[in-house]
A protein has these predicted regions:
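Hydrophobic structural segments
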Residues: 1-258
Length: 258
């Protein structure tokens, strides 16, 4: 018999809690106990994902984004933690510790782009290393193709939207930061990167990075993080072969792209 605690222990080995940022809230955030036969892996726990878990008879959801982040002052039926408890589904969430962990979110992203001799930077928030020379428009197009192939397709519009600020220099050294990493462009420059590929970057991040000689590619928060779900599922299957581990097909980018 596999327990919720056993699943949590595997996830703690994969993403050690001590790697989490001080402000974060990873862990076993909803514990309904009971036997576990089937697990659903996702980026976000949304009402749609809870319904998917119920339909697929999954009693544990393993997610990246914490389903409880700020202190709860009340619960109502529209709240996802309420829905989880009502359905008897436990939630294990590994956030910045999974970002920083070896084989975690950033390493999966680095693998996609063939980053060699990689090192961690920005306190584990990113990875940087060498790639075969490529132009920024070519790299952005490559990101579009690779990430779209690994994300759940939306009902309408493109699966992934990529935008870039190009200095005009070819990329030999690439930095990647999952999710909202645009503010860390200075750290990428300090590592000698020609380009930073991240999920989100604002207008001023792009202006400043380009002025300082760093190209910037923003490929979407969801798109740069969802690919880790397959890696987490594989790790769980290897550690607990008696479990059936599924990757969510209903966790999609909240944005629709034209």
């Amino acid at each position: 018999m596999t327990t919720v605690q056993q699943v949590y222990e595997v996830m703690q080995r994969l993403a050690p809690p001590e790697l989490a940022e001080h402000w974060d809230n990873p862990g076993l955030l909803v514990d309904c106990g009971g036997e576990v036969h089937r697990v659903l892996v996702t980026l976000d726990i949304t009402p749609e994902v809870v319904a998917e878990a119920v339909a697929k008879q999954c009693t544990v959801i393993v997610a990246h984004h914490p389903v409880i982040f700020d202190p709860l002052k009340r619960l109502c039926p529209a709240d996802v933690p309420y829905q989880l408890v009502q359905a008897g589904i436990s939630a294990i969430c590994m956030h910045t510790n999974l970002d920083a962990a070896e084989g975690g979110v950033n390493d999966v992203l680095a693998d996609l782009f063939g980053i060699r001799q990689r090192t961690a930077f920005a306190d584990g928030c990113g990875r940087v290393g060498d790639i075969d020379p490529i132009t920024v428009p070519e790299l952005a197009a490559l990101a579009q193709r690779k990430l779209a192939a690994l994300c759940n397709a939306p009902d309408t519009g493109a699966a992934v939207q990529v935008k870039f600020a190009d200095t005009g220099k070819p990329v030999h050294r690439l930095a990647v930061i999952r999710g909202a990493g645009g503010s860390l462009f200075a750290e990428a420059i300090a590592e000698g990167a020609d380009c930073l590929l991240t999920g989100e970057a604002n207008h001023h991040h792009a202006l400043d990075a380009k002025r300082l000689g760093l190209s910037l590619i923003a490929a979407g928060h969801y798109a740069t993080e969802f690919p880790v779900t397959a890696a987490v599922a594989s790790a769980l299957r290897a550690a607990l072969p008696e479990l059936e581990v599924l990757v969510s097909t209903d966790n999609r980018d909240p944005y629709t792209y034209l």
